[in-house]
Amino acid sequence: MTKSHEAVTHWYPASVAAKRPTPWWYWGRAVYVSRRDYWKITKYFLAVGIPLGAIGVMFRLPLAFWASVALAEIGLLLLAYSLFGLYRMYGHPGARYVRRLVELGSLKGKVTVADLHIGTYRHAFLLSDVLPEATIQTVDCWNVEGESPEEAVQDVRDLEAPPTSNPRIVAYKADHFTLPLPDASCDAVCFGFGTHEIPTGGAREKLFSEANRILRPGGKVLLFEHGWDAHNYVIFGPVIHHVTKRQDWDKFLRERFDDVKYARSTQAVDLFAGTRR
């Protein structure tokens, strides 16, 4: 059983099951769940900038004063770029890398896709847009003992309800990483942002084994994730250190699937596609 979670009141509005959230809502939620990291980084800038500015004024040291001003400008510039980067990932431009991922996997037509996630249905909506004839079976796979290593995960889960607005999107819940879908019933499975939160050493391996089970012969596995690189570091800050590295995803997928392909989107998202053996 997962550890019980105490109800938290959020000031960001929750989604409504019968209405699809807008890209603006998803971008706003990404900013909201990142608020702790933004505040943590801000405190570092203030801890250096305020004393530096005070020294410059009190001791009439122009260099120290202007250094504090420059630090503030750098901080604001980084914040602006981070907000812009989050918009490109979670706002309207996000559909571009999902479309590219689907093309990388040569997926089209009346296919059945399992969207495997940790509590956000954004990926299911985007897949339904890019694949207008597809049926999307969206499965909440979060079933981790204890607290998440990232508090943002629970915020994400609290704010979005399983959708009922699209008849081509059907929501399910996994049971300890066992998927409630029949063997060889899907043409593709898709893993998206947040997959790195599923622990290795058992849980992640089981989930990908389940993905193999539900795939038809020759079925496709698709994955898009944040990378551990300078671009993502500027957008997310030091929290990006806990994501799975691109080379580790590549090795993990090649151990389980054939013909693994990789591409990098302009939104700093790593894209992978492979084929069931």
List each language-model region with its residue ranges:
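Core SAM-dependent methyltransferase catalytic element
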Residues: 258-277
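Conserved beta-strand signature within the Rossmann-like core of class I S-adenosyl-L-methionine
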Residues: 218-225
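Class I SAM-dependent methyltransferase Rossmann-like catalytic core
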Residues: 28-47, 57-106
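Short alpha-helix
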Residues: 240-257, 262
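Conserved class I S-adenosyl-L-methionine
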Residues: 109-120
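A short glycine-rich, Lys/Arg-flanked "PGG" loop and its adjoining helix->strand segment in the class I
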Residues: 204-217
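A short acidic, Gly/Pro-enriched loop at the edge of an enzyme's catalytic core
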Residues: 177-189
